[in-house]
């Protein structure tokens, strides 16, 4: 899709650039960044990120700058309208999710409740 606004989940340039760098370090061009939701964390749900070279039935792929972000259907329902970004700061560097569906988030931003 060429229109980023039509996508159910946004993927920033900063996140795409970092994924591209990490994939280059792994020397496996088939890797994709998988974003998923699991139960846990201090708020009930938590975000997870992992590299994956497999696609599962129902996975959605969002491509940007030659790299792919993959989301399973169960996680996607909690992430619609959100944005995956990459930040570097005093707290370290990490991927973060801005999620309009979250009613509350923990202080570090890695878990949320609905």
Swiss-Prot record:
SUPFAM superfamilies documented for this protein:
HesB-like domain (SSF89360)
Q: Provide a GO CC annotation, any one.
A: cytosol
Q: Cofactor binding mode, per the note?
A: Binds 1 iron-sulfur cluster per subunit.
Give one Pfam family.
Answer: Fe-S_biosyn
**Which keywords describe this protein according to UniProt?**
Iron, Iron-sulfur, Metal-binding
The protein's required cofactors? iron-sulfur cluster
Residues bound to iron-sulfur cluster: 42, 106, 108
This protein's source sits in the domain of life called Bacteria
User: One GO MF term, please?
Assistant: iron ion binding
Q: Which HAMAP family does the UniProt record give?
A: Fe_S_insert_ErpA
Q: How does it assemble?
A: Homodimer.
Role this protein plays: Required for insertion of 4Fe-4S clusters for at least IspG.
Question: What is the protein named?
Answer: Iron-sulfur cluster insertion protein ErpA
Give the originating organism: Proteus mirabilis (strain HI4320)
Gene label: erpA
């Amino acid at each position: 899709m060429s229109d980023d606004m039509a996508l159910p989940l946004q993927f920033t340039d900063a996140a795409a650039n970092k994924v591209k760098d990490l994939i280059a370090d792994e020397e496996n061009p088939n890797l994709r960044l998988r974003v998923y939701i699991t139960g846990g964390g201090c708020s009930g749900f938590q975000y997870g990120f992992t590299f994956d070279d497999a696609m599962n039935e129902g996975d959605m792929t969002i491509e940007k700058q030659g790299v792919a972000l993959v989301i399973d259907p169960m996680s996607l329902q909690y992430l619609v309208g959100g944005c995956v970004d990459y930040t570097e700061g005093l707290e370290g560097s990490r991927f973060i999710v801005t999620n309009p569906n979250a009613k509350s988030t923990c202080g570090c931003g890695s878990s949320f409740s609905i």
